Amino acid sequence: MTRLETIEGIGPVYASQLRAAGIATVEALLAAGATPAGRQELEQRSRIGHALILEWVNIADLMRIKGVGEEYSDLLEEAGVDTIKELRNRVPENLYEALVKTNEAKRLVRRLPTLGMVRGWVQQAKVLPPKVIY
């Protein structure tokens, strides 16, 4: 099980609010926030706003891709990919170039993913069943 704090933006205060609402892991966050009704309930129980809950659920969803993790999920999000649905529709070579440019501008990761890694992410996204409903 993955700690909530591995998601960028979830620090001790937000993690405490989520735990008080019954969410202790990234996996539990994804399960609870997979539907609009689930996110609304989570917002009410945690007293955290809709935009943050949705952002974190999307990151949790991206973290299902093997090799993405907390570091690369931030890079993907900054490059304009914040859902698995969006990732599955990307051309790996174009996405790789966008990741390079994003990292040059924002210095988010020390080591960029390889083109082979990005190809693998896109392929995984194409076969993973959808979890988040919008």
Task: Indicate where each model-derived feature is located.
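C-terminal extensions
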Residues: 1-134
